Amino acid sequence: MGGSERDQFAAAVHDLLSGADVPAAARRWADGDLAPGLALWRRLAGLGVSALAVPEKWGGLGASPLDLVVACEELGHHALPGPVAESLAAVPALLAVLADTGLADTGLADTGLADTGLADTGLADTGLAPGACGERGLGGEWLAGLAAGDLIATLAMPPRLPFAADAGAARLVLLAEDGAVYRARLGAMHRSVDPARSLSEARGGEVLARDAAEAAARALDLGALACSAQLLGAGRALLEASVRHASVRAQFGRPVGAFQAVKHKLADVAIGLEFARPLLDAAATALGDDAATAGRDVSAAKVACADAAYRAARAALQVHGAIGYTAELDLSLWLAKVRALVPAWGSQAEHRARVMRELSGQGGPR
């Protein structure tokens, strides 16, 4: 997409989600009722959101990371529930390599979906019929399902991504660990600070690919990029909510937004968000170009977007006052989302250390 096309695409995603009651869907998702949220995912698939990171040869759009960033920013802006970075970015990147290079010699490549045992996880409900893999192979069928919006996937990538997010909504759960990719078996579930987000332990099952460290590293970077875009979008939403509230909440006979201290605080939030955007775009461009600096660029973007979103969350809570603490206020959905995504896909310390290593020429693990 060109610049104007991206703007139009972002506007289309924004309009779709603005016309839906996403906060209500997120609350029901947190209560275990996934139906409204999954309906939103299907509608977004109709716009091509789920096909962005899937190569054209597998039925996707083969879009650039910049296009993916545009979509994920809007999804974060509206606090869409579900494994956004996992299903829209990381899993397609990982499966694309598996589909091109072939699955590990486990017999999986020559079998239908029913033969893999995935029917027990609910994958049969996605419309990918048993034995339908044909010449495309299992990896290709999964990619086709992702592109069409028939399949939602998630993954764990220890140690940076120790848990699989929203595995209950996913019909495919992967584990990338120690250079191999597995079809994961789920373990214990853990609570997240975000009620609309669940975290599940993932254990290695059947091997899908060996010697996949390079593919996993790219998937990890693409996931971190998508998470950064979500954070930037969530930060924007929090700033907008703060400005609206500051214009109507009165103290001492004046809107609190008229006080210089509040103006400066919100201006600092706006500056932080705007300064993070060029780093996010640069990281997306570097990933799209397979630049040597892509890894550190992604880490720099993650740090900047997470810091900016966290600052927006703190300011929003302060501007809203005591009402900001209440779960009934929709603001809480974005506050929780930011708190959950800031440490996801690598902590701030890990990403800062990565930038320092690469700038100092020390290299080290990606």
Language-model segment annotations:
Residues P65-L68, S87, G139:
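Amphipathic alpha-helical segments in well-structured domains
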Residues A96-V97, G145-L146, A286:
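Hydrophobic side-chain positions on well-ordered alpha-helices
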Residues D100-E240, R244:
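FAD-binding core of flavoproteins
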Residues G82-A99:
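N-terminal glycine-rich flavin-associated loop
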Residues M1-H78, L103-A132, D221-R366:
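Alpha-helical interface subdomain recognition
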Residues L17-A20, L75, A90, L94, ...:
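Alpha-helix C-terminal capping segments
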Residues A53, L80-P83, I152-T154, V173:
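Short glycine-aspartate micro-motif
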